[in-house]
Amino acid sequence: MVGRTIKKWWPVFVLPTFAAFVIGFLWPFIWGIYLSFCKFTTVQDVTFVGFSNYSKILLDSTFSHSFWLTVVFAFVSSILINVLAFFIALALTKGYRGTNAFRTVFFMPNLIGGIVLGYIWQTLLNGLLSKWGQPLLSLSAKNGFIGMLILLMWQQIGYMMIIYIAGLNNVSPDLIEAAQIDGATSRLILFKIKIPMIMPSVTICTFLTLTNGFKMFDQNLSLTGGDPGKQSQLLALNIYDTFYARSGPQWKGIGQAKAVVFFVLVVVIALIQLRATSSKEVQQ
């Protein structure tokens, strides 16, 4: 009876969600791709220009710099965050006293907004750099890059730690006990049992950290603003700067084209990463 009712009325329940998906995501997405082939000031003042916007991207030195800076930043931040989060999770699953308090402390930075974090860390890091006689974040591309790494690591390590803790807690104690009986060392247990068994967690955390690194915007805006001379400007901020900070209808279309390229880049790298890490997962 219930099954027949669901079969009869399921479109009524699906329709609101589907309509929200089409209106809120699908239609803006398709329209955004079309606008990347146009020059415009508003959506009612659109002129089709073909691939002109995409060809101009290739000649934009700020875009190419932001592109490669973002790729390096995303991979470096992903590696550092995952390695540190895993070893912190490993330490916090040993049953030491105060473990829950440490978990809470490590997770709390994830609850703070990116803009607020950017200004907080800007004050902290500039104070330290000034004391040490080093260039401020806005005056050194190297210091700005390192500052963004520190900020993102501080913000996200706690969240990834929770995922790794969940994975480590699901590793069967029987497997570890059997390995210990067979004379396996702690190092061997870590690399041959624990890490292979938590590969689903590694897949999730790597995906999240990679995509977060690629699309980082608010922290970049508030911490360095892309200074000096846009040398610390990541791709999301470069797109924003192109779309809003430059005048003229051609820049709107170029900014939209950059956004499409950015979307394709993130999707391709995320799919490659998911395939690579998923293939290492152990069937339980």
Task: Tell me what each language-model feature is.
Residues G3-Q284:
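A structural signal for multi-pass alpha-helical bundles of membrane permease subunits
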